[in-house]
């Protein structure tokens, strides 16, 4: 049975941990508000651009740019796995890594060649245990401040576009956590190249009208497709950032509650041990007095 001193030290240690988790919860809540606002603000543009491209693609048939139609094969797949740079966020990183592993297994069972580009340190650490041989690159987001992912998304988009044009892969799929609400972040796999509109993207109703484009549909697509890919990556980074903070806030809230329960249980154990020690000392005093 632990001594009173041990119990007292443990209570103090848990109280210190509780203060840390509470502080982390408050910081995550503040960051979540900003991240959620940024993700929400980016959605209308991304959705509208996806709708415009969907309408343009419908008029070009099979003769469009390769970023839209592909290069005629789907043998080599590049998985872009986006997770957080930091842990202590519940199952946020683990769920994305799990989806990535399932996707890798599925593609390999179909005889496909798989490559992995990681964005964020935590996902890379998890996948490295089994799939480090598939890694082709890594993007570090630790220097990004205040959800300003514009430069990072542009860099990744250019990397993917150039890699596709150089024949390094045939299909690129982005795996990230889509932010639904504070309690729900959904691991999602979205094909980036060849470009496809995200599931649930709005469609522009032309009312039966036929638009004439100047310049041509092909020229517009050539200009818009790289921007569309960059926009989808930026949106995913913002969604992932909001989901990370929401998951961390929830995890730290649970940790704070658990610490409170543990302190209560330890205090009860401490009081019982102290009472038992006092009772024992009283018995010894009484026994000694009777012996006299």
Curated annotation (Swiss-Prot):
Family assignment from sequence similarity: Belongs to the ATPase gamma chain family.
**Gene of origin?**
atpG
How does the record classify its membrane topology? Peripheral membrane protein
Presence of the UniProt keyword Cell membrane in the record:
yes
- Complexes and interactors: F-type ATPases have 2 components, CF(1) - the catalytic core - and CF(0) - the membrane proton channel. CF(1) has five subunits: alpha(3), beta(3), gamma(1), delta(1), epsilon(1). CF(0) has three main subunits: a, b and c.
Function as written in the Swiss-Prot or TrEMBL entry: Produces ATP from ADP in the presence of a proton gradient across the membrane. The gamma chain is believed to be important in regulating ATPase activity and the flow of protons through the CF(0) complex.
In terms of CDD domains, this protein maps to:
F1-ATPase_gamma (cd12151)
Q: Where in the cell is it found?
A: Cell inner membrane
Q: What is its main location?
A: membrane
User: What organism does the record attribute this protein to?
Assistant: Hyphomonas neptunium (strain ATCC 15444)
Domain of life according to the entry: Bacteria
Keywords, sorted A to Z: ATP synthesis, Cell inner membrane, Cell membrane, CF(1), Hydrogen ion transport, Ion transport, Membrane, Transport
Q: Which GO terms describe its cellular component?
A: plasma membrane; proton-transporting ATP synthase complex
Q: What GO MF terms are annotated? A: ATP binding; proton-transporting ATP synthase activity, rotational mechanism
GO BP, one example?
A: proton motive force-driven plasma membrane ATP synthesis
Q: Which Pfam families match?
A: ATP-synt
- Protein's recorded name: ATP synthase gamma chain
């Amino acid at each position: 049975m632990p001594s009173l001193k041990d119990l007292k030290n443990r209570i103090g240690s848990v109280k210190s941990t509780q203060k840390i988790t509470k502080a982390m919860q408050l910081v995550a809540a503040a960051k979540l508000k900003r991240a959620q606002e940024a993700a929400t603000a980016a959605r209308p543009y991304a959705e509208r651009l996806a709708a415009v491209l969907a309408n343009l693609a419908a008029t070009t048939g099979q003769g469009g740019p390769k970023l839209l139609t592909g290069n005629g094969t789907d043998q080599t797949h590049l998985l872009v796995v986006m997770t957080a740079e930091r842990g202590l966020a519940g199952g946020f990183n683990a769920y994305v890594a799990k989806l990535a592993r399932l996707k890798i297994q599925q593609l390999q069972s179909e005889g496909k060649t798989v490559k992995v580009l990681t964005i964020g340190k935590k996902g890379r650490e998890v996948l490295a245990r089994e799939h480090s041989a598939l890694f082709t690159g890594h993007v570090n987001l630790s220097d990004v401040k205040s959800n300003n992912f514009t430069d990072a998304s542009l860099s990744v988009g250019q990397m993917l576009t150039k890699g596709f044009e150089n024949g390094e892969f045939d299909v690129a799929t982005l795996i990230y956590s889509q932010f639904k609400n504070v309690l729900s972040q959904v691991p999602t796999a979205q094909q980036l190249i060849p470009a496809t509109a995200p599931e649930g993207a709005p469609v522009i109703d032309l009312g039966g009208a036929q638009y004439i484009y100047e310049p041509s549909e092909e020229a517009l697509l050539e200009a818009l497709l790289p921007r569309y890919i960059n926009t989808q990556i930026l949106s995913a980074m913002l969604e992932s950032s909001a989901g990370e903070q929401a998951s961390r806030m929830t995890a730290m809230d649970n940790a704070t509650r658990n610490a409170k329960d543990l302190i209560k249980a330890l205090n009860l154990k401490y009081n019982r041990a102290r009472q038992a020690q006092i009772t024992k000392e009283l018995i010894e005093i009484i026994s000694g007095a009777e012996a006299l």
